[in-house]
């Protein structure tokens, strides 16, 4: 079956923003204007098509990134048909993992900002993730109809806080109640949308006289930005020669795709203004799969390999999300990077080393699914029937194996014990938790060996609350949850040289003999664990060295202070000895473990606690109370600024997670319910001696 839309006319984009910037409404309008969706879904009444899980509709926040396909021929029907695959991403910090994994499979992003709130904490997180995966982006300043809306202030914030080179390609006509439309700086004409047709009809008009000077100023800045795309354009621009519309667009596109500029637009999705022009900008400035570098990976024998976005290349795809669907079971969302695959084909998963048959292939429009027979390079679809695949796995042609770069997932920072309300539900709860953990790699399930309790871990209180809620709704398991526990870590500050570990058992017959000498030292923060083999002259035989490493790795799971996982250490095997008959892998595993434990005790072990970046938005009269309260929680207040558009202060602080449980309740009573806060994991830091002592003693008693 030939391809309907050439790959050059594909756009795989994400729409991401801070909570409440109007991202879901923006996506809904896209679906409406692209003719897919004939009734506008409003988040206010819980009917938005993209928000398809029950809790999302209740909370009014988007939790799961639904992937949707839409077609667009331009606001004025002036383009050949383009296919836009949209991944809707959540804006709440507890769901950062969702944003992270959608960024991994996107080619471009549209960042939505609230014209009043501007750049908020989650906006910064999303921006960092987009930088990590080098995702080109455009910015859409939404809610221009709100009181306090200020397009140019948001531009300054993008420059100051995000270090983004934002280039307006539109400026607003009016603001707040008087927001009428935009000035298109490329055409130098105003666009006014017609309210009666819900913004489907529009007209170009002359720029209002009071805006002519401002429009000219920003037009010149935009043309200069476009001219910097090439020597030739720059020379013509500097010699005073005008650039055509086409040349301006080409220059802006080149620089956007290279990540050098961020074109800026504005509108009000709720009032049906500006989204149509934003779709045109997606086509004009964001890359198609062929405009971004080929995807890199490696073959099974670890040679570097790449796949180009072409139907003629071998099939390769990345599974980026797993969902459980009540009707068809497990859905695996995947992005095809190269080649073609048909339903019924066998694909290979090199991460799991398994071949699997691809069952049905579904293309999702929010939660409405269309079954299709094949997918090609650039497509995003969902597969039914893959049992082994998990998030981040590669799917590829069994004869042309490639392993694409895996995604990195954050470690959970909070844990809770969970048990079913009735004993009969124990098994059902196990199945439910495993299913949820498969869907969400930042959610972990484990059994506490001492107490036998089931422990769930995640990125924040809201994250775990929603998962427990889903367990009840989707699997019918009611569970009670224990008090949240902090995920402490242990590390060392000092070095320990020549630490000996001997495991000897010789009582007649075959004995055990393992003897190693280690140097143990700290690694930089985030450095993880490193094992170095520095054995000379075969004093420890080659075949036993991996066993020493294994013994140390096992010991890393329970540190010497309070049994928490050990991070950021380096162990160097420097010496040892063996016995011809009695030495074996197990003996060296035990010796490695004993030596490392002793080394850790001698190398100044310390307890680390997770520190959270906290931002509180509060009316001015409560600022003192809020800051005092954060300080009493061992918080360090880093700064304070006015909330954009007036109305209070933003207090920024770094606070230990251990002191932040139940903070939302305290904040409500401190500020008569008028303040809001966001919190996300920042880094691990050494816990003060008195805190460490209390944690260690509690573990001993427990």
Swiss-Prot record:
The keyword GTP-binding applies. It holds the Pfam family EFG_III. Disulfide bonds: none annotated. Keywords: Cytoplasm, Elongation factor, GTP-binding, Nucleotide-binding, Plasmid, Protein biosynthesis. GO terms for cellular component: cytoplasm. GTP binds at residues 17-24, 88-92, 142-145. Residues 8-290 form the tr-type G domain. InterPro entries: EFG_II (IPR041095), EFG_III (IPR009022), EFG_III/V (IPR035647), EFG_IV (IPR047872), EFG_V (IPR035649), EFG_V-like (IPR000640), EFTu-like_2 (IPR004161), G_TR_CS (IPR031157). HAMAP family: EF_G_EF_2_B (MF_00054_B). Belongs to the TRAFAC class translation factor GTPase superfamily. Classic translation factor GTPase family. EF-G/EF-2 subfamily. This is Elongation factor G 2. The lineage of its organism: Bacteria, Pseudomonadati, Pseudomonadota, Betaproteobacteria, Burkholderiales.
């Amino acid at each position: 079956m030939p391809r309907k839309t050439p790959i050059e006319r594909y756009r795989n984009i994400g729409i991401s923003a801070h909570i409440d910037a109007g991202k879901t409404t923006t996506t809904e309008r896209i679906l409406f204007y692209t003719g897919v969706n004939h009734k506008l879904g409003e988040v206010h009444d819980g009917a938005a098509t993209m928000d398809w899980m029950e809790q999302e509709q209740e909370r009014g926040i988007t939790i799961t990134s639904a992937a949707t396909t839409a077609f667009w021929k331009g606001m004025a029907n002036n383009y050949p048909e383009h296919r836009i695959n949209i991944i809707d991403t959540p804006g709440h910090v507890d769901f950062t993992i969702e944003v992270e994994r959608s960024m991994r499979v996107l080619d471009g992003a549209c960042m939505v900002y609230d014209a009043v709130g501007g750049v908020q904490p989650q906006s910064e997180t999303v921006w960092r993730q987009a930088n990590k995966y080098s995702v080109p982006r455009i910015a859409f300043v939404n809610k221009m109809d709100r009181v306090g809306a200020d397009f140019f202030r948001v531009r300054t914030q993008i420059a100051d806080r995000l270090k983004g080179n934002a280039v307006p390609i539109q400026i607003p006509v009016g603001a707040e109640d008087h927001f009428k439309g935009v000035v298109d700086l490329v055409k130098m004409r105003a666009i006014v949308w017609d309210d009666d047709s819900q913004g489907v009809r529009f007209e170009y008009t002359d720029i209002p006289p009071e805006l002519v000077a401002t429009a000219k100023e920003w037009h010149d800045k935009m043309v200069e930005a476009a001219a910097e795309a090439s020597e030739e354009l720059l020379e013509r621009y500097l010699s005073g020669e005008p650039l055509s519309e086409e040349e301006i667009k080409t220059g802006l596109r080149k620089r956007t795709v290279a990540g050098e500029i961020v074109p800026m637009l504005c509108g009000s999705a709720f009032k049906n203004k500006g989204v149509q022009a934003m779709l045109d900008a997606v086509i004009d400035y964001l890359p198609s799969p062929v405009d971004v570098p080929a995807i890199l990976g490696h073959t099974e024998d670890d040679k570097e390999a790449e796949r180009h976005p072409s139907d003629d290349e071998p099939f390769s795809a990345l599974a980026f999300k797993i969902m459980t669907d009540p009707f068809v079971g497990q859905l695996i969302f995947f992005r095809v990077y190269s080649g073609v695959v048909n339903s019924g084909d066998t694909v290979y998963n090199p991460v799991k080393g398994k071949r699997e048959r691809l069952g049905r292939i579904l293309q999702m429009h929010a939660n409405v699914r269309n079954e299709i027979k094949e997918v090609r390079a650039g497509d995003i679809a969902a597969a039914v029937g893959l049992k082994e695949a998990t998030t981040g796995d590669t799917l590829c042609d069994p004869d042309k194996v490639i392993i694409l770069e895996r995604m990195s997932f954050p470690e959970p920072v909070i844990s809770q014990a969970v048990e079913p309300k009735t004993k009969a539900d124990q098994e059902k709860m196990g199945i439910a938790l495993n299913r949820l953990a498969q869907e969400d790699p930042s959610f972990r399930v484990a059994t506490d060996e001492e107490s036998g309790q089931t422990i769930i871990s995640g990125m924040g209180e809201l994250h775990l609350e929603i998962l427990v809620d889903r367990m009840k709704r989707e699997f019918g398991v009611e569970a009670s949850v224990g008090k949240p526990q902090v995920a402490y870590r242990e590390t060392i500050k000092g070095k320990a040289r020549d630490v000996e570990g001997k495991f000897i058992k010789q009582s007649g017959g075959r004995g055990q003999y393992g003897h190693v000498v280690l140097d143990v030292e700290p690694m930089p923060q985030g450095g993880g664990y490193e094992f170095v083999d520095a054995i000379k002259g075969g004093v420890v035989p080659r075949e036993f060295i991996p066993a020493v490493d294994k013994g140390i790795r096992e010991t890393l799971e329970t540190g010497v202070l309070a049994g928490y996982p050990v991070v950021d250490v380096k162990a160097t095997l420097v010496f040892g000895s063996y016995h011809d008959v009695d030495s074996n892998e197990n003996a060296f595993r035990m010796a490695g473990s004993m030596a490392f434990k002793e080394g850790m005790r001698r190398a100044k072990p310390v307890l680390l606690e997770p520190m959270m970046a906290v931002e509180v938005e509060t009316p001015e009269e409560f600022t003192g109370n809020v800051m005092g309260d954060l300080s009493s929680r061992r918080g360090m207040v880093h700064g304070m600024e006015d909330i954009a558009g007036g109305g209070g202060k933003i207090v920024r602080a770094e606070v230990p997670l251990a002191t932040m449980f139940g903070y939302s309740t305290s904040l409500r009573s401190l500020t008569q319910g008028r303040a809001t806060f966001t919190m996300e994991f920042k880094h691990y830091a050494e816990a003060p001696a008195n805190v460490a002592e209390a944690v260690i003693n509690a573990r001993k008693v427990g």
